[in-house]
Amino acid sequence: MYAVIVTGGKQYKVTEGEFLKIEKLELATGEAVTFDRVLLIGNGDDVKIGAPVVDGAKVVAEVVSQGRHDKVRIIKFRRRKHHMKRQGHRQWFTEIKITGIQA
């Protein structure tokens, strides 16, 4: 069984037991989180598509860890002007484990 959920402005296809890095949620490690915005649920040939969400469907997950992604380097450069600006960014994430999909 799989589902498509929305969190942090992004869509993720998830299955039970899968580990996933999503945008940061303010939750402690070990806490449970429920995703109610389920766009699609599939089980073999049986597929339920929401309009826009599937009624009564939810995905339950457990917070595994909080962390930061690898650094993304930004360079702004002006040719022939001896000007270069360097910057870096590390985005926070929450790693979750999908524990259940309920339709």
UniProtKB/Swiss-Prot annotation:
This is Large ribosomal subunit protein bL21. One of its GO terms (biological process) is translation. Keywords: Ribonucleoprotein, Ribosomal protein, RNA-binding, rRNA-binding. InterPro entries: bL21-like, bL21-like_sf, Ribosomal_bL21, Ribosomal_bL21_CS. PROSITE patterns: RIBOSOMAL_L21. Part of the 50S ribosomal subunit. Contacts protein L20. Belongs to the bacterial ribosomal protein bL21 family. Coiled coil: none annotated. It comes from the Bacteria. This protein binds to 23S rRNA in the presence of protein L20. It comes from Ectopseudomonas mendocina (strain ymp). Signal peptide: none annotated. The gene is rplU. GO terms for cellular component: cytoplasm; ribonucleoprotein complex; ribosome.
